[in-house]
Amino acid sequence: MGIRIYNDLTRKKEDFVPLEPGKVRFYNCGPTVYDYFHIGNARNFVVFDTVRRYLEYRGYQVTFVQNFTDIDDRMIKRARERGITVSELAEEMIQAYFADAGALGVRPADVHPRATALIDEQIAMIQQLIDKGHAYVVEGGDVYFRVTTSPDYGKLSHKNLEELVAGASERVDPDDRKEHPFDFALWKGQKPGEPAWPAPWGPGRPGWHIECSAMARKYLGDTIDIHAGGEDLTFPHHENEIAQSEAVTGKPFARYWMHNAHLMIDGAKMSKSVGNFFTVRDILKRYDGEVVRMFLLSAHYRTQLSFSDQLMEDTRRALERLYNTVANLEHLAKTAPRAEMTAEEQAVLAELSQARERFVAAMDDDFNTAEGLAVIFDLSRELNSRVKPGASAAFAEGGLALLRELAGVLGLLERKAQPQELDAEIEALIAARQEARKARNFAEADRIRDQLRAMGIILEDTPQGVRWRRA
């Protein structure tokens, strides 16, 4: 069996079959760069970075595009508040994004298009929509998409127009220039003091939805394999992307739609508009980025995840246990009395390698990172119990390579387990303890043992001498 993806378009798991064998065209809706992103936003970036990593692990050539929305009402408002230009605000926050996302192990996309860099492409799409009767210009230079020309409008949110109107009257823009309450802006006519670009129907700026359609089409073509985003983007943003893109091309816009669930705090969605959020920049002052990443992968991406300091501490300790295993294996490999594996060690390593099959089965099932992590922790425990002092270097190195391989797919265990200077400190303490024992200063020897235990170091007396491992 291969990868199966829960497709929000059909609301069922489907076999993943890309448009072009071996290649994946993947678009993720990126941030609006008016502020530092919060940990709820980070879940999206980490989840779909991991999906990309796993697709590559399974042998696909992935073209991953994640945009920056660098012009909208919020950006204009924030730039005015700070007394800077919208482009200056965008540049500052884009650089902040790369710094903060990088701290979480999120790799840069193959392309990070900015909406303002593709104005011509957006104008061209809008003109095509006008020419085909799917859009209309109103007084003031605004252009609206005519939703009644999209016969399957609502197919992603699984509601028809009548149901949408009946259930969302408070969210509908009451603009009487619109033909239908759900017609949406493709172009916004210029207002005093706002950035604007020339267009055939008058100066202004693009609407949010057409920005993503144009950027996805520019770099991935008329039909893409996977379109991803947070679940709050399903309607209206992604619904509107589908309507306008398919009206232009006459082709399916995206074949698989993936949405990550919200991050919750105190039972409510974490949101900048509500104010119940923590920026990643602030959280990184308290926790290592790898801890944050593992926390965000600890639940299946379609399951709501609650944020708390207790859960973050639990995650920190869990990650520490994995690094302790790495450090133990590195130490055993470095101090091994022999290089080659015995037949018994080869058999044990082959048995442990079955973890790879379990990991792949978990991730093939709609990218179940929670189950994938469980496999990694099971492997870590097995390695600690079965790779003992006296093992061959090849045995320890083989176990370590397997652990790093699987964890690396999730973007974990990519740094060195412990700095060399700490290893040297531990060795010095062990030597001091040995000297104390020789001098029959058992109180001092016990004190050093307790100090090492407090550092998470367990001493083991062997025929070859004292060995140590991390608890």
Curated annotation (Swiss-Prot):
Which Gene3D superfamilies does the record associate with it? Answer: Cysteine-tRNA ligase, C-terminal anti-codon recognition domain, HUPs
Top-level taxon: Bacteria
Q: Which co-factor is required?
A: Zn(2+)
Which positions bind Zn(2+)?
A: 29, 212, 237, 241
Entry keyword set = Aminoacyl-tRNA synthetase, ATP-binding, Cytoplasm, Ligase, Metal-binding, Nucleotide-binding, Protein biosynthesis, Zinc
Give the subcellular location. Cytoplasm
Residues that, per the record, bind ATP: 272
User: May I have one GO cellular component term?
Assistant: cytosol
Q: What are the disulphide bonds in this sequence?
A: none
Q: Recall the GO molecular function terms of this protein's record.
A: ATP binding; cysteine-tRNA ligase activity; zinc ion binding
Cofactor: binding details: Binds 1 zinc ion per subunit.
Q: What is its main location?
A: cytoplasm
Task: State the family it belongs to.
Answer: Belongs to the class-I aminoacyl-tRNA synthetase family.
Protein name per UniProt = Cysteine--tRNA ligase
